A protein has these predicted regions:
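Extended substrate-binding grooves/exosites of carbohydrate-active enzymes
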Residues: 158-186
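An active-site-proximal structural segment forming one wall of the substrate-binding cleft
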Residues: 2-36, 59-66, 70
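Surface beta-strand/loop "capping" patches
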Residues: 176-205
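A broad structural signal for short, well-ordered beta-strand segments within beta-sheet-rich domains
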Residues: 6-7, 32, 154, 187-189
Length: 205
């Protein structure tokens, strides 16, 4: 893979111009659930796996700022940038940016939570969790995987595989996993003080 010099000021200036225009057009768009800060590293995933040449912390911070400044009304996720520069974790949290891992369990079950990052983010900021390609992980311990969901508290979760094949073989797991993602409010009791006639209507606010 060919990769740019991510620290090059000309490269960064043009990136910032692009992100600024994207923000003008798409910030706050109700059809966009979130935007990844994915302009750095191999495949936009923050790491430099294919070259081994890392960008600087100042460059990483500038990339975070250009998105946070131009998408103030859209959920943002940072991908692996803070894995390399832990000092930026608190900065991202302060700016309301969520954390996305691409991908969990890609190396080994022992790395399935990236616990330090998730622990810092999930209580105040959203988590976006993506799994290793499913065909490489058949034979997962489903209960252990669901336990990871409880630890990580994801608001979004992506399984990388053809949905038909996945649902044919693992529908029960997918349905159980879906119940661990996001938030569900289940009222135990409801008290209604308004009165109405039989078959009438009560307005709830």
């Amino acid at each position: 893979y060919l990769m740019p010099d991510f620290n090059d000021p000309i490269f960064l200036d043009y990136q910032e111009k692009l992100v600024t225009e994207l923000g003008k057009r798409y910030n706050g768009n109700p059809n966009i659930a979130y935007v990844d800060i994915g302009n750095m590293g191999t495949w936009g995933e923050g790491h430099t796996y294919t070259s081994g040449v890392m960008y600087s912390q100042d460059t990483a911070k500038r990339c975070i700022d250009m998105y946070a400044d131009n998408f103030p009304d859209t959920h943002l996720f940072v991908i692996n940038l803070t894995q390399h520069y832990a000092q930026l974790e608190d900065y991202c949290i302060e700016r309301g940016i969520g954390w996305r891992n691409d991908s969990f369990w890609v190396s080994s079950p022992q790395l399935y939570t990236y616990q330090s990052q998730y622990d810092k983010y999930w209580k105040t900021n959203p988590i976006n969790m993506e799994a290793q390609h499913w065909e490489r992980l058949q034979g997962w311990n489903e209960d252990e995987t669901l336990a990871a969901f409880s630890d990580i508290h994801p608001s979004y979760f992506g399984l990388q595989w053809y949905i038909g094949n996945l649902m044919d073989g693992y529908r029960s797991f997918v349905e159980r996993a879906a119940k661990r993602v996001g938030y569900r409010f289940l009222p135990e009791t409801v008290s209604i003080t308004n009165k109405t006639r039989a078959h009438g209507y009560i307005e709830l606010n």
